[in-house]
Amino acid sequence: MRIPYSNLFSAAAGLALFASTACAAPVMPATDSDIAHAGIRPELDNAFYDSHGEAATPKHKPHAGPNAAPLLSASNADTTGLDSHYIIVLQPDLSEQEFQAHTNWVSEMHQMDIASQEDEYYDTSDSNYMFGLKHVYDFGEDSFKGYSGQFSSNIVEQIRLHPHVIAVERDQVVSIKKLETQSGAPWGLARISHKSVKYDDIGKYVYDSSAGDNITAYVVDTGVSIHHVEFEGRASWGATIPSGDVDEDNNGHGTHVAGTIASRAYGVAKKAEIVAVKVLRSSGSGTMADVIAGVEWTVRHHKSSGKKTSVGNMSLGGGNSFVLDMAVDSAVTNGVIYAVAAGNEYDDACYSSPAASKKAITVGASTINDQMAYFSNYGSCVDIFAPGLNILSTWIGSNTSTNTISGTSMATPHVAGLSAYYLGLHPAASASEVKDAIIKMGIHDVLLSIPVGSSTINLLAFNGAQE
């Protein structure tokens, strides 16, 4: 069976707040009026996930009519400039030869389609011109495989009928809204290193001196100001995914996130190595296709490092996306444990992706008074809460700049940092073992203001320090 057309997508979610302004990287998924929407974590049938949550790999017969792979979409779309852009997911067990043959077939079909169109399609400067394949995704053997590109509706229908195809999803705009500065002092590090915080504990971070030594943390975001003094030479540029963009963070969001993970003064894992993976343009916008390409890059880089487990941070998200959740789950299976933001809509996090990812650590935001932050998403998809209101960290503008901002985007790197911190102490741990440890170490039943009846775990991040 194919994925149901319902239960797949819901409203978009912003992930970082600056003053009263949402300032995360919300994914704005596309809308398709003929697809039903529901705001729950999608439960796919056994044709797609086995008992371990892995993508299953049944051999499908060729599609026909209603058996075509679903064309997925979501509500509250911003598809500006993305007409006819799609992301295609293939069976994960395809051989290298089958995968290559499939992409060759798509390219050939696309060229034949272009040749058959009106003259306007021959003008590559025309907005109607279809450019074909853009990204090809291959996370490794029996892992996430697929591609993205711009195709006519005729080619999309042919793709949906191909037996290798699991799903087709419309590409989506990812963006960060205007940033504003808030006043406030750092307190998050003190909170995650004390089971209960007394007045004298404010500003005191208790931690093991190893603090993420020799652990890699990938910041999948707007980039990182890698020469900031707070990174002490431990930050490097990994990849710039958006075509034609620069190897810089001209936004600030990614640099702030990286600082909470591993900077000298503001970081949880003060010896971890930061790798910048830019998936959002300096303007603060990007596409879902580029985000998935960034996740793929982290998997490939991690595998080449020879390390058993690395850490990833995604302080971005939006409407529920089967494709993004599947990609993130595959990354975790391949050894990159991702911390992802729950979202800032004061709504069910299961409405959002990658918050609905089963294998990532989904993080809600808490306040200095141990309350669930007024903006934080909640629900059964949230795994843990961490400090997310008035968080001081590194910033752009100079190599010493700082900024204080808020959101689940700020809570998430506390948990990514904790993951690196734990791996520094337990380098043989697998990605799933890291997630289990983070949850096991958490402080139970200290948070206030969690919505009654929301199935939300009352768990606050803690580094396990002995006071």
Curated annotation (Swiss-Prot):
Residue runs in coiled coils:
none
- Which GO CC annotations does the UniProt entry carry? extracellular space; fungal-type vacuole; fungal-type vacuole lumen; Golgi apparatus; late endosome lumen
Q: Which InterPro entries match?
A: PCSK9_ProteinaseK-like (IPR034193), Peptidase_S8/S53_dom (IPR000209), Peptidase_S8/S53_dom_sf (IPR036852), Peptidase_S8_Asp-AS (IPR023827), Peptidase_S8_His-AS (IPR022398), Peptidase_S8_Ser-AS (IPR023828), Peptidase_S8_subtilisin-like (IPR050131), Peptidase_S8_subtilisin-rel (IPR015500)
* MF GO annotations: endopeptidase activity; peptidase activity; serine-type endopeptidase activity
A Pfam family of the record is Peptidase_S8
Q: Which residues form the active site?
A: 221, 253, 409
- The lineage's top-level taxon is Eukaryota
Domain annotation Inhibitor I9: ranges: 86-176
- The EC number of this protein is 3.4.21.-
Please list the GO biological process terms of this entry.
Answer: autophagy; conjugation with cellular fusion; zymogen activation
Q: Which UniProt keywords apply?
A: Hydrolase, Protease, Serine protease
Q: Which residues form the Peptidase S8 domain?
A: 186-467
Q: In which family does this protein belong, per the annotation?
A: Belongs to the peptidase S8 family.
Q: What is this protein called?
A: Sexual differentiation process putative subtilase-type proteinase isp6
Specify the species: Schizosaccharomyces pombe (strain 972 / ATCC 24843)
Name of the gene this protein is made from? isp6
